[in-house]
Regions:
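A short helix-loop-beta-strand connector motif used in the catalytic cores of GNAT acetyltransferases and
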Residues: 1-6, 10-17, 32-37, 54
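Short hydrophobic/aromatic beta-strand or adjacent loop that forms the aromatic wall/cage
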Residues: 2, 125-131
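Conserved acyl-donor/pantetheine-binding loop and adjacent beta-alpha core of acyl/acetyltransferases
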Residues: 24, 28-57, 65, 118
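Conserved catalytic-core motifs of GNAT/GCN5-like acyltransferases
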Residues: 34, 92-93, 105-126
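Hydrophobic adenine-recognition pocket in adenosine-nucleotide-binding enzymes
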Residues: 58-60, 93
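Conserved acetyl-CoA-binding loop-helix of GNAT-fold acetyltransferases
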Residues: 60, 66-79, 106
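Conserved short alpha-helix immediately C-terminal to the canonical SAM/SAH-binding motif I
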Residues: 73, 97-100
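Conserved GNAT acetyl-CoA-binding A-motif
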Residues: 74, 81-93
C-alpha cells in the first residue's frame, strides 16, 4: 500500500477527495468518519464506543521518511477530531508492520485487539487495531 492507492482514490473521487495541482505530495492520510463493520466485530475491546474517526492510508514519501511528516499529519488528524468533537481515533495495521506499530505507540495509540477485513481484495485478512482518545478542550462543549 502506498501513494498509488491514494492517487487512485483521488481520481475516483472516493472519500470526498478532490484533485489539485501539487509540486510534490509529502504525505497523505484518509480520515473516515464512517462506522466500519470490521471495527464493530473486534476480538478485544475498544476504550470507547463513542463516535470515532478511522485513519486509512497514512503514507509519507519514502525520500523524506523519519523527518516528522507523519507525526504532523497525525496532529492535523487530531485537530480535525477536536473540531468535530470526536473523542476517538482508530486504525488498523498488518500484524508484521513493525514501523507502523512503533509509530502508533510513540504517538499515544494503544493496541486493543484484532479485526478481520470485509472488503475485496482483503476479505478475511487479519489486522491489529489501535485506538487513541483525544483530549478535547473542555470549553468546546
Amino acid at each position: 500500500m502506498g501513494i498509488s492507492y491514494v492517487l487512485e482514490d483521488i481520481e475516483k473521487n472516493e472519500n470526498g477527495l478532490k484533485s489539485e495541482s501539487f509540486t510534490k505530495i509529502l504525505g497523505t492520510i484518509v480520515l473516515s468518519p464512517k462506522k466500519e463493520m470490521p471495527y464493530s466485530k473486534i476480538e478485544g475491546k475498544w476504550i470507547t464506543n463513542d463516535d470515532y474517526i478511522v485513519i486509512h492510508r497514512l503514507t509519507v514519501d519514502s525520500e523524506i521518511k523519519n523527518k516528522g511528516i507523519a507525526t504532523k499529519i497525525l496532529e492535523f488528524s487530531e485537530k480535525e477530531c477536536i473540531k468535530n468533537k470526536i473523542l476517538s481515533i482508530k486504525t488498523d495495521s498488518h500484524e508484521n508492520n513493525e514501523p507502523m506499530k512503533k509509530f502508533l505507540e510513540k504517538n499515544g495509540f494503544s493496541y486493543y485487539g484484532v479485526i478481520y477485513l470485509d472488503r475485496e481484495p482483503d476479505i478475511g485478512e487479519m489486522r491489529i487495531v489501535y485506538e487513541k482518545i483525544i483530549k478535547i478542550p473542555h470549553k468546546l462543549f
